[in-house]
């Protein structure tokens, strides 16, 4: 039991470190080009790296490891000055947790590739719906 707990904590901490590293990497890149809609190249790279870490750690360490990494990474990114505005942090954290929950709960039922697609589409839809609502609610100018 003790070894499992130590492994869980150690790997989860490594996942948090990797997600923060991915966010820092995205922060040092130039503003970038628009890819599609509101997405920039920087956002696409950073988001893809973060999601990759969340998928890997959810699959390798467990569902709750991924959820913890997803929740804490958003808060830590904000505290380091690299995350979104404060009112959006809980929305992004919940989007990350949703990604991990969907992927983790579907594991073994469908192919991992299909699970990745389903989880990513749900997270994207969740963020596309809620982030603009939160931004408007707090009165952030366009």
Please identify what each model-predicted range represents.
Residues 1-142:
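Loop-helix junctions at membrane interfaces
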């Amino acid at each position: 039991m003790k070894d499992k707990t130590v492994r869980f904590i150690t790997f989860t901490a490594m996942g948090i470190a990797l997600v923060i590293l991915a966010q820092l990497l995205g922060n040092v890149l130039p503003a970038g080009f628009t890819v599609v809609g509101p997405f920039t190249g920087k956002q696409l790279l950073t988001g893809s790296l973060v999601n990759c870490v969340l998928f890997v750690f959810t699959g390798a360490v467990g569902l709750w490891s991924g959820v913890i990494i997803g929740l804490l990474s958003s808060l830590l990114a904000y505290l380091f000055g690299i995350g979104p505005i404060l009112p959006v942090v809980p929305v992004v954290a919940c989007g990350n947790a949703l990604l991990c929950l969907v992927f983790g709960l579907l594991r073994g039922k469908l192919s991992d590739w299909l699970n990745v697609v389903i989880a990513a589409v749900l997270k994207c839809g969740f963020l596309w719906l809620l982030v603009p609502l939160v931004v408007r609610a707090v009165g952030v100018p366009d």
